[in-house]
């Protein structure tokens, strides 16, 4: 499992997890500007985290629409 996914899936505060995920995502896209493969990987990480947290709190689904 990706270290970011593991860390976020063990966070109790979902708002903090959402903020951390947003920062990670923005950094990845910034590092490889226009890198399609990297963007797809970032999206995959977001989808996986949504699935991990879905049963705990449906508000995490907001992340999906913000990208």
UniProtKB/Swiss-Prot annotation:
Q: Where is the signal peptide?
A: 1-21
Q: Which UniProt keywords apply?
A: Cleavage on pair of basic residues, Secreted, Signal
Instruction: Please give an example of a GO cellular component term from this record.
Output: extracellular region
Per the entry, what this protein does is: Shows contractile activity on isolated ileum smooth muscle.
Task: Name the organs or tissues of expression.
Answer: Expressed by the venom gland.
Q: Which domain of life is it from?
A: Eukaryota
Stated name of the protein: Vespin
Q: Which organism is it from?
A: Vespa magnifica (Hornet)
Q: Give the location in the cell.
A: Secreted
């Amino acid at each position: 499992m990706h270290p970011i996914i593991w860390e976020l899936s063990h966070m109790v505060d979902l708002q903090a997890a959402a903020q951390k995920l947003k920062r990670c995502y923005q950094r990845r896209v910034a590092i490889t500007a226009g890198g399609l493969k990297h963007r797809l990987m970032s999206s995959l990480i977001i989808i996986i985290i949504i699935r991990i947290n879905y049963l705990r709190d449906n508000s995490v689904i907001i992340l999906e629409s913000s990208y």
